[in-house]
Amino acid sequence: MSERAPVVTVDGPSGAGKGTISQLLAERLGYKLLDSGAIYRVLALAAIHHNVELDNEESLTLLAAHLDVQFVTGNEGKGIKVVLEGEDVSTTIRSQECSNAASKVAAFPRVREALLRRQRAFAEAPGLIADGRDMGTVVFPATPAKLYLTATAEERAQRRYNQLQDKGFDVNIDQLLSEIKERDDRDMNRSVAPLVPAEDALIIDTTNINIEDVLDLALTHIHQKLQVPA
């Protein structure tokens, strides 16, 4: 396939820093941003709202085909606003319930196929930062600029704990760690689009690296691969 605009893919497990780096890259390069994980979270939330069982692939696929979701940018560095059926669900979809449900619905091949075309449609000028789990391996495999961020499960659990605490959610870090390990196992071993780095991706372990250094590594890679101005 050929992308209609420059695309940078940022893949990796939950809590590795994909969201933060993707937003910083979009701001630095002036590119649009796609939070692929949000699409699955929105679908999971829509399923909950419409009383669709999370193990019903046929109903989920039908819901995905008609999913009314928009990503509204321009929030002055505060990320994108996720809108489902006219309602701002940016905070709601970040709950642990939606996070776990999203991983479940994403495991269905027909659901992923239904959302694949919509994700690719986000590749528009001047460029796109695509944040997800299979952006470089499935959605935008032709782009030369691929990143894969990772970190230890313990570090990712701590980051998730801090994030949810800041948003006012009551969470238990041991439970978060257990859920992250379970999700890693589920995502890495599923039959369709398992969570693995693209062969040509730059792998960055963010466990002991500050965000500025991660950003520098990412920008250097992007400049080399896309030949965009530094």
From Swiss-Prot:
Taxonomy, superkingdom: Bacteria
Primary site of residence: cytoplasm
Subcellular location as annotated: Cytoplasm
Gene Ontology biological-process entries: nucleobase-containing small molecule interconversion; pyrimidine nucleotide metabolic process
Residues that coordinate or bind ATP: G12, P13, S14, G15, A16, G17, K18, G19, T20
Enzyme Commission code: 2.7.4.25
Keyword DNA-binding assigned: no
Keywords tagged on the record: ATP-binding, Cytoplasm, Kinase, Nucleotide-binding, Transferase
GO CC, alphabetical: cytosol
InterPro entries named in the record: Cytidylate_kin, Cytidylate_kinase_dom, P-loop_NTPase
Alphabetized GO MF terms: ATP binding; CMP kinase activity; dCMP kinase activity
Enzyme class: transferase
NCBIfam families: cmk
Entry-linked PANTHER family: CYTIDYLATE KINASE, CYTIDYLATE KINASE/PANTOATE-BETA-ALANINE LIGASE
Protein name: Cytidylate kinase
Source organism of this protein record: Shewanella halifaxensis (strain HAW-EB4)
Species classification: Bacteria, Pseudomonadati, Pseudomonadota, Gammaproteobacteria, Alteromonadales
